[in-house]
């Protein structure tokens, strides 16, 4: 995982001011890892703001709205 400088652009594209609810954790394979401050769940975004999740060791693209809700509300997938 690459550390700093933090890249907030993908998250800002999607949620604007709500970025304050997240911590930037690092970058890996061109994807930005953000952690929600309350639920402690990760939101993984590419440069265009598309969402990904880890499934069986692979990164799979998923619907942003559903993934954002899961992360923010602490909903199990």
Language-model regions, residue ranges each:
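Acidic, low-complexity, intrinsically disordered interaction modules
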Residues: 19-61
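Mixed-charge, Lys/Arg-enriched low-complexity segments
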Residues: 1-14, 52-77
């Amino acid at each position: 995982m690459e550390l700093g400088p933090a890249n907030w652009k993908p998250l800002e594209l999607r949620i604007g001011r709500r970025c304050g609810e997240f911590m930037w954790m690092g970058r890996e394979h061109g994807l930005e890892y953000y952690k929600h401050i309350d639920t402690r769940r990760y939101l993984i975004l590419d440069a265009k703001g598309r969402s990904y999740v880890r499934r069986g060791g692979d990164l799979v693209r998923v619907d942003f709205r559903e993934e954002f809700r899961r992360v923010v509300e602490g909903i199990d997938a």
